[in-house]
């Protein structure tokens, strides 16, 4: 009897081979090809020994099948070699930067390059390709802010299928780019000289970061964006060099950043999880799909939440709570290997509720002590090519602390709070202690990973549950 799983198993093997090949260097690829030739010869010899026992039709069928498998695998090798060349070109820039190498085994927690004297740092901006000029954006200027919003809205991160794109609202940009200590000089833009059109941007904000047992003065790098039509101009590497130069001139030589792609070299890789709050809309826009044997009515019932939070003492944070809540979070973050160190002023900035931007709730006991905290920021995504829905309103889990209220109760209340301000989905990374509530609260694993990186700092890699850093 024929094996019903033979075709599927073959496909899995091909995918596995292709993945192995894609991860290898070109030298290794040549070995793989050589190995294929050896295996092919061995297969031919084995087939020759069995020829006498097989009818001609079976021989021909086996030959066609073997050739098809060989061609498919050779195509996978060819595609992987092309991918490897592209990756090598992409990594050429990073090979010039103080970052850990992909094959480097790190056991220390230290800077890669020593800090420089200000006199050693390049005084003039880096040279842009012809036809472009540097600008420093003023986010308090309505025109500059609108231009930045438009650039990001039309050219920033979108999903692989080009169905959704982050829609950072102007007031969100001001909140995320103007924390305590922000510098206008770190809001770096690129314009076309003739038209003045904004076609590139990168930003930095000051921060303190704990890496294992050391606290670093760093910047968080974000919103690196180049207009789609200019991505062959190699503008992005110049933007990175220029923001590095400007930050170095202030005496800061380390940075943290995240990316959905793999670069040299992630400190950690986290995965997004999603909890439907408005399942009908999410299915309509193809953000999610109905599970097998599930109707829309059953799906809506599955994700239905109570009308109001249930935890006694659960309420939105107030100005009077700030110092106690700051101490609660400060103590909690010390448990993790990579975490921010917030000053009181920074805590007030990041956790004071702003409608449509950030929301924060605490649980207070009878004596007024703050025992628990939950927070999320609001980041809609534009829906591309849908006749009805133009936006998916997403809540992103920020920082959460549970000391008295069970995790499931606290986060269920957070879901209710987000649903009550018309959020469609609640997203969370599998860092800190978030995994504890994913399954019970009906979160589903997403297909996107987020890599964490440190610039000019090497340290041993970390598991997601050792990470307590959220970058927008």
Swiss-Prot record:
Annotated EC? 2.3.1.97
**Main location as per UniProt:** membrane
Query: Which effects follow disruption of this gene?
Result: Mutant embryos show disrupted actin cytoskeleton and abnormal cell morphology. The range of phenotypes includes head involution failure, dorsal closure, and germ-band retraction, as well as widespread ectopic apoptosis.
> Which GO BP terms sit in this record?
dorsal closure; protein localization to membrane
Q: Which InterPro entries match?
A: Acyl_CoA_acyltransferase, NMT, NMT_C, NMT_CS, NMT_N
Q: What protein family is recorded?
A: Belongs to the NMT family.
Enumerate the subcellular locations listed in this protein's record, separating them with semicolons.
Membrane
Q: Which reaction does it catalyse?
A: N-terminal glycyl-[protein] + tetradecanoyl-CoA = N-tetradecanoylglycyl-[protein] + CoA + H(+)
Functional note? Adds a myristoyl group (tetradecanoyl group) to the N-terminal glycine residue of certain cellular proteins. Such protein modification are critical for the developmental processes that involve cell shape changes and movement.
Q: Which UniProt keywords apply?
A: Acyltransferase, Membrane, Transferase
Gene Ontology cellular component? cytosol; membrane
Is the Membrane keyword given for this protein? yes
Q: Where does tetradecanoyl-CoA bind?
A: 93-94, 223-226, 232, 234-236
Q: Its membrane topology, per UniProt? A: Peripheral membrane protein
Question: What top-level branch of life does the organism fall under?
Answer: Eukaryota
Could you tell me which SUPFAM superfamilies the record lists for this protein?
A: Acyl-CoA N-acyltransferases (Nat) (SSF55729)
Q: What is this protein called?
A: Glycylpeptide N-tetradecanoyltransferase
For this chain, one GO molecular function annotation is: glycylpeptide N-tetradecanoyltransferase activity
Asked whether the UniProt record includes Transferase among its keywords, one would answer: yes
Chain spans, region Disordered: 1-23, 43-65
Enzyme class, top EC level, equals transferase
């Amino acid at each position: 009897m024929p094996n019903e799983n033979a075709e599927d198993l073959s496909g899995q093997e091909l995918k596995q081979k292709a993945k192995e090949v894609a991860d290898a260097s070109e030298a290794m690829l040549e070995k793989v090809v050589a190995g294929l030739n050896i295996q092919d010869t061995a297969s031919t010899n084995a087939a020759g020994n069995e020829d006498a026992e097989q009818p001609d039709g079976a021989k021909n069928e086996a030959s066609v099948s073997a050739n098809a498998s060989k061609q498919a695998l050779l195509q996978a090798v060819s595609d992987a070699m092309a991918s490897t060349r592209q990756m090598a070109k992409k990594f050429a820039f990073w090979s010039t930067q103080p970052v850990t190498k992909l094959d480097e085994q790190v056991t220390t927690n230290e800077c890669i390059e020593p800090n420089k004297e200000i006199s050693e740092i390049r005084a003039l901006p880096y040279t842009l390709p012809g036809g472009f000029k540097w600008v420093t954006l003023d986010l308090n200027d309505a025109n500059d802010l609108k231009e930045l919003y438009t650039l990001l809205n039309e050219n920033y991160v979108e999903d692989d299928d080009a169905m959704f794109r982050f829609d950072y609202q102007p007031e969100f940009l001001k909140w995320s780019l103007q924390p305590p200590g922000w510098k206008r000089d770190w809001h770096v833009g690129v314009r076309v000289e003739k038209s003045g059109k904004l076609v590139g941007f990168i930003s930095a904000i000051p921060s303190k970061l704990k890496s294992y047992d050391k606290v670093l003065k760093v910047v968080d790098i974000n919103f690196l964006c180049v207009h789609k039509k200019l991505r062959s101009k190699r503008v992005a590497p110049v933007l990175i060099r220029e923001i590095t130069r400007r930050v170095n001139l202030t005496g800061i030589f380390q940075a943290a950043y995240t990316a959905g792609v793999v670069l040299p070299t992630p400190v950690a890789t986290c995965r997004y999880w999603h909890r439907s709050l408005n399942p009908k809309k999410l299915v309509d826009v193809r953000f999610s799909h109905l599970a097998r044997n599930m109707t829309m009515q059953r799906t809506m019932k599955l994700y239905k939440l109570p009308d109001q939070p249930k935890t006694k003492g659960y309420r939105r944070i107030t100005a009077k709570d700030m110092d106690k809540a700051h101490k609660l979070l400060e103590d909690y973050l010390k448990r993790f290997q990579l975490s921010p160190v917030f000053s009181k002023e920074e805590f007030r900035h990041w956790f004071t509720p702003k409608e449509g931007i950030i929301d924060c709730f605490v649980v207070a006991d009878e004596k007024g002590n703050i025992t628990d905290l939950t927070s999320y920021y609001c980041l809609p995504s534009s829906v591309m090519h849908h006749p009805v829905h133009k936006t998916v309103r997403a809540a992103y889990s920020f920082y959460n602390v549970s000391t008295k209220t069970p995790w499931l109760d606290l986060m269920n209340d957070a879901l209710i709070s987000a649903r009550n301000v018309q959020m469609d989905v609640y997203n969370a990374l599998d860092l800190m202690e978030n995994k504890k509530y994913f399954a019970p609260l009906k979160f589903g694993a997403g297909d996107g990973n987020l890599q964490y990186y440190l610039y000019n700092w090497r340290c041993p890699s970390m598991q997601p549950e050792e990470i307590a850093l959220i970058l927008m």
